[in-house]
Swiss-Prot record:
Increases the formation of ribosomal termination complexes and stimulates activities of RF-1 and RF-2. It binds guanine nucleotides and has strong preference for UGA stop codons. It may interact directly with the ribosome. The stimulation of RF-1 and RF-2 is significantly reduced by GTP and GDP, but not by GMP. The gene is prfC. This is Peptide chain release factor 3. It comes from Bordetella pertussis (strain Tohama I / ATCC BAA-589 / NCTC 13251). It is found in: Cytoplasm. Its main location: cytoplasm. GO terms for biological process: regulation of translational termination.
Length: 535
């Protein structure tokens, strides 16, 4: 099959939600319905020692939360689906942001009892800024939840996009009878059960079929009235508006009971876009170009703790990848010939021989590749959009056993390079390493990973710093003067970019007034010392 045909088969999307909306459960059920796994792991089923396929890190299994991003590839209806499961905890929004740069669509999961929640709004803002198409799944209809019309109104009000229901619930909670497929004009009858795949589901055709009101009475009377209202007042589905991120198809269901999952999976194949062109600084890169390009959007250390490995996750942007091909790392100009390249089902890997635009491949390496690196067959290209945001929380870190100092530095270097935490090395001699984060849980996860993956028992201590700004200047002498005058507040990150550590907003304002030739940046791009001014 040629490159354009293979690209047309690809669907690459991320699942996003507020914590506990059921994102991990839906991820599992999509894998189950696509035939990628035989049994769906329940995050809550501790006694059965069964964990979600996408929650593979030890701390995730202990707490039942997603703190790393997982990549899973599966085939369904002659399409190759690349599913990226994002961190569910809000403290890891930076990793989620990076994942959203690697996808062509997003599946938004909303808890029908809670509606649109803060983390959902933040993630949707990122999707809207990138015009990412969004499919919405309103989950947990088998529980006591809010009215569906109210939920649609909230989505439109908070997220600024039109909703187009593809299905509609008949009843809710204990009275949940199923969902009516508006486009196919039939009702799928709800049956509880976590291992069903829908082959034996019961359907009733036609909104005017007397069998439905006979069985579901008042619940259907309300639902049919709402469906008629939707058919009259709601906008028709416009795929161009959907692809522009202005309209979202909406599905209702219960992921834990495998209900409504089939419709979502079909919509991803039928409506989500194949990979499109990507804009580099130098030119537009089209997916069906003959030559390979790819971007490192994630680096993960110790996916296999037994081998202490580091895997670079590369989104293929164009062309065809072949195992052993000669590639150039644009940032360094160095050449590499990766042979042990893998595809993923969470932490399980398989060697692959080829990949196409939209696919995510894993390249094991020992620090050669960094976040934001661009791989090509020789061309020098730069992609932006993978930022480090200025941290808002700081802690100093020391090792309890001085003999493990080297292991601490190795561990923090690797965790810093993968973006799990930001690591700052003070310019002043003798200063403890500083960790910067956007949420408290990041510190806990790093301490846990240092202990379990590197054998380092680290001590975290409070820090007086509240933020940081990377500093540059067109005048090297002006920059050096500022750094000398503020030596106690200067530190270097993992790529040796200088940063000004701040104790209060007033301190930053004073510095900006006193040193007009120095630029203070709230973000730094991955893949080198490229800076921006807005976080």
């Amino acid at each position: 099959m040629n490159i354009p045909q293979e690209v047309a088969r690809r669907r690459t999307f991320a699942i996003i939600s507020h914590p506990d909306a059921g994102k991990t459960t839906l991820t599992e059920k999509l894998l189950l319905f696509a035939g990628a796994i035989q049994i769906a792991g329940s995050v809550k089923a501790r006694k059965a020692s069964r964990h979600a396929s996408s929650d593979w890190m030890e701390i995730e299994k202990q707490r039942g939360i997603s703190v790393a991003s997982s990549v899973m590839q599966m085939e369904y209806r002659d399409c190759v689906i690349n599913l990226l499961d994002t961190p569910g905890h809000q403290d890891f929004s930076e990793d989620t942001y990076r994942v959203l740069t690697a996808v062509d669509a997003a599946l938004m999961v909303i808890d029908a009892a809670n509606g649109v929640e803060p983390q959902t709004i933040r993630l949707l803002q990122v999707c809207r800024a990138r015009n990412t198409p969004i499919i919405t799944f309103i989950n947990k209809l088998d529980r006591e939840v809010r009215e569906p019309l109210e939920l649609l109104s909230e989505i439109e009000g908070h997220l600024g996009m039109d909703t187009v229901p593809f299905s509609w619930p008949v009843g809710m909670g204990k009275a949940f009878g199923g969902v009516f497929d508006i486009r196919r004009n039939r009702m799928r009858i709800f049956r509880a059960g976590q291992e069903r795949r829908g082959e034996d589901d019961e359907f009733i055709d036609g909104l005017d079929n007397p069998e439905i009101p006979r069985r579901f009475g008042a619940a259907f009377a309300q639902a049919s009235g709402e469906i008629e209202l939707i058919n009259e007042a709601a906008p028709a589905f416009d795929r161009e508006a959907f692809l522009a991120g202005k309209q979202t198809p909406v599905f209702f269901g219960s992921a834990i009971n495998n209900f409504g999952v089939q419709e979502v999976l079909d919509a991803l194949v039928d409506q989500a876009p194949a990979p499109g062109p990507r804009q580099a600084l130098e030119r537009e890169v089209r997916p069906d170009e003959p030559k390979f390009t790819g971007v490192v959007f994630k680096v993960q250390a110790n996916m296999d703790p037994a081998h202490r490995d580091r895997v670079a996750f590369v989104r293929v942007s164009s062309g065809r990848f072949e195992r052993g091909m000669r590639l150039k790392v644009a940032r360094t100009g160095k050449e590499m010939r990766p042979n042990n390249v893998v595809s993923f089902l969470s932490q399980r890997r398989e060697l692959l021989d080829e990949a196409y635009a939209g696919d995510v491949i894993g390249i094991p390496n020992h620090g050669v590749l960094q976040l934001g690196d661009v791989l090509t067959e020789g061309e020098s290209l730069r992609f932006t959009g993978l930022p480090f945001f200025a941290p808002e929380l700081f802690q100093a870190v020391e090792v309890k056993d001085p003999l493990r100092t080297k292991q601490l530095r190795v561990g923090l270097t690797q965790l810093g390079e993968e973006g799990a935490i930001q690591v700052f090395r003070p310019e002043a001699a003798g200063g403890a390493l500083l960790l910067g984060a956007v949420g408290q849980l990041q510190f806990e996860v790093v301490a846990h990973r240092l202990k379990t993956e590197y054998g380092v028992d680290a001590r975290m201590m409070p820090s007086r710093y509240t933020s940081a700004r990377w500093i540059t200047s067109d005048d090297p002498r002006a920059l050096r003067k500022f750094m000398d005058a503020n030596a106690a507040h200067i530190a270097y990150d993992v790529v040796d970019a200088a940063a000004f550590l701040i104790t209060s907003p007033a301190q930053l304002r004073v510095a900006e007034d006193l040193y007009p030739n120095v630029k203070f940046h709230a973000l730094r791009e991955h893949g080198g010392k490229v800076f921006g001014d807005k976080a």
